[in-house]
Amino acid sequence: MAERKYFGTDGVRGKVGTFPITPDFALKLGWAAGKVLASQGSRQVLIGKDTRISGYMLESALEAGLAAAGLSAAFIGPMPTPAVAYLTRTFRAEAGIVISASHNPYYDNGIKFFSAQGTKLPDEIEEAIEAMLEQPIDCVESAELGRASRIKDAAGRYIEFCKGTFPTELSLSGYKIVVDCANGATYHIAPNVMRELGAEVIEIGTSPNGMNINEKCGATDIKALKAKVLETKADVGLAYDGDGDRIMMVDHLGNVVDGDQILFIIAREDLRAGKLKGGVVGTLMSNMSLEISLKTLGIPFIRANVGDRYVLEKMVENDWKLGGENSGHIIIADKNTTGDGIIASLAVLTAMAQHKLSLNELASAVKLFPQVLINVRFSGGTNPLESDAVKAVAAEVEKRLAGKGRILLRKSGTEPLIRVMVECSDAELARKSAEEIVEAVKAN
């Protein structure tokens, strides 16, 4: 694979106004993508975005570039990332573009592409776009220019798709649900999905102004959701991130239910229904309790590198249909092609309604092991993890934790940091073990 100059693991991302998140680069990127896609017979691309104020600027620039290459753009407005993947497929568009920086602050933004199948673009297409970016823009003849249009019922189409994953014989009638949309792309989708399925919905984080996305709300900051659930005596709270591909939940007692617990609830329900295909993919950060709980049910479990992209790769490699991260990216491959917060939350609500159990009762099957995370800064070019002394201490700790805990030591890819993670059923043992490793790292 050729080295990438522009595309990272999740498209192009950065601070607005700083290369590459500038209007001139977005126009050039639209043109380059348009040229590559047009050479394969493409004619229409869908463009969706989250609620950042910079989305207007970037979608206009992308559309201009696409038009110059002869491709038409269909705008679908603020829309969750998984909705863009779904609509790209159902509209038979040749590609989809998402303008979002997910859980980042409003002053960041990003651009990523979906294939016609609603999946990540093949590596060879991304590489061809990178190569085209090095060429000067040349505009097609006037008669061949692309056009711009708007799909006005995109939100309604996705709402119906989400509702279609909830069993028709069940209802959310009688449930009081607090929905926190992070002032992001799900603000006009998630509350309507829950309401139309019968729930009483209390909304927070549904008043985007272009600059308040992910600000003290949503899946990455759920204090407001916990408070609202307790204040209103709600049955459950749902928190999505800015682009709607993550979900975190809160039970009626105010306890957070994270991605690991959500993954277990869905896996167990699929197993009961005879719908679980293969096993479950987690990540290096997935709690050991998830692994133990799944294996108790006879469900295979493997770990991928951190990042939903790597989870999906392992799922495809093993032909498994369920995977996710403790951060709330949950991929249910027989329902959508990417992480989908609304679909995942509906899968948990299905289990609640089906068995008439609270979220607290469902999640209690996975008692998460305490996790201790410590970042250790080091100087110099030598990686402390390669030291024999550190390796010896790590091996001793692993031996001590055998069967009841684990360690994960990683060197940061962007800073001179060693990330030390220890988890164990015994919180005090986890803390002492982490401190022991940290001291060894500092000494080297």
Curated annotation (Swiss-Prot):
- Residues annotated to bind Mg(2+): 102, 241, 243, 245
Q: Which UniProt keywords apply?
A: Isomerase, Magnesium, Metal-binding, Phosphoprotein
Q: In which domain of life is the source organism classified?
A: Bacteria
The cofactor remark states:
Binds 1 Mg(2+) ion per subunit.
Q: What PANTHER family does UniProt report for this protein, alphabetically?
A: PHOSPHOGLUCOMUTASE (ALPHA-D-GLUCOSE-1,6-BISPHOSPHATE-DEPENDENT), PHOSPHOHEXOSE MUTASE
What family does the entry list? Belongs to the phosphohexose mutase family.
Which protein are we looking at?
Phosphoglucosamine mutase
Q: Which organism is it from?
A: Mannheimia succiniciproducens (strain KCTC 0769BP / MBEL55E)
